[in-house]
């Protein structure tokens, strides 16, 4: 919502197309005539389309209108879901128990609606065995396929191989 809407005397146009509070068009009127109509109804004259020829003004209760707009904005902010990206790190030769523990954490993240970045970190000479890292990520993808979908396939970036998994309910 624009904070600086022109209301009543702040409207500079000489002629305006007037719409009443019910949405009915009252035609093209002079600014003063439109202001007089608004004041007799104890309402405000609000410029809603300044770029139209002639500009469009509406007769309404401006305070109530601003309150409604603020309420709508607040509701829209509440409905926005912030999606976090959680990272789970593996090594190419990870043990079964360690893998299960990290898998359990990743499943929790996906259930909460967060994206999961699964990364395999290669240290030292392990970088020569990239296929081991791919096997770990493939196994991870297989284990979480009921909760998430693969957003990016496994790829190398520096000494890390990673993939992104998004929760399934986000796609629907």
Curated annotation (Swiss-Prot):
Keyword presence, Protein biosynthesis: yes
Q: Name one Pfam family in it.
A: IF3_N
Q: In the UniProt record, does the keyword Cell wall biogenesis/degradation occur?
A: no
Q: Where in the cell is it found?
A: Cytoplasm
InterPro entries in the cross-refs: T_IF-3_C_sf (IPR036788), T_IF-3_N_sf (IPR036787), Translation_initiation_fac3_CS (IPR019813), Translation_initiation_fac_3 (IPR001288), Translation_initiation_fac_3_C (IPR019815), Translation_initiation_fac_3_N (IPR019814)
Keywords, in A-Z order: Cytoplasm, Initiation factor, Protein biosynthesis
Q: Which GO terms describe its biological process?
A: ribosome disassembly
Q: Which SUPFAM superfamilies match?
A: Translation initiation factor IF3, C-terminal domain, Translation initiation factor IF3, N-terminal domain
Q: Name one GO molecular function term.
A: ribosome binding
Q: Which family does it belong to?
A: Belongs to the IF-3 family.
Instruction: Note the NCBIfam families from the entry.
Output: infC (TIGR00168)
> Could you tell me what this protein does?
IF-3 binds to the 30S ribosomal subunit and shifts the equilibrium between 70S ribosomes and their 50S and 30S subunits in favor of the free subunits, thus enhancing the availability of 30S subunits on which protein synthesis initiation begins.
Subunit relationships: Monomer.
Q: Which HAMAP family match?
A: IF_3
- Recorded protein name is Translation initiation factor IF-3
The protein's organism comes out as Oceanobacillus iheyensis (strain DSM 14371 / CIP 107618 / JCM 11309 / KCTC 3954 / HTE831)
According to the entry, what is the taxonomic lineage of the organism?
A: Bacteria, Bacillati, Bacillota, Bacilli, Bacillales
């Amino acid at each position: 919502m624009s904070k600086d809407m022109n209301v009543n005397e702040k409207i500079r146009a000489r002629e305006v197309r007037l719409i009443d509070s019910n949405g009915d068009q009252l035609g093209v009127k002079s600014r003063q005539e439109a202001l007089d109509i608004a004041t007799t109804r104890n309402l405000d004259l609000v410029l809603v389309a300044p770029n139209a020829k002639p500009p469009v003004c509406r007769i309404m209760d401006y305070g109530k209108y601003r309150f409604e707009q603020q309420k709508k904005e607040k509701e829209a902010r509440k409905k926005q879901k912030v999606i976090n990206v959680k990272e789970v790190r593996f090594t190419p030769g990870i043990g079964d128990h360690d893998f299960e523990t990290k898998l359990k954490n990743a499943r929790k993240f996906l259930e909460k609606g967060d994206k999961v970045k699964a990364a395999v970190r290669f240290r030292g000479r392990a970088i020569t065995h990239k296929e081991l890292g791919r096997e770990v990520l493939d196994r991870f993808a297989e284990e979480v396929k009921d909760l998430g979908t693969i957003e990016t396939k496994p790829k190398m970036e520096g000494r890390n191989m990673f993939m992104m998994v998004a929760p399934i309910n986000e796609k629907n």
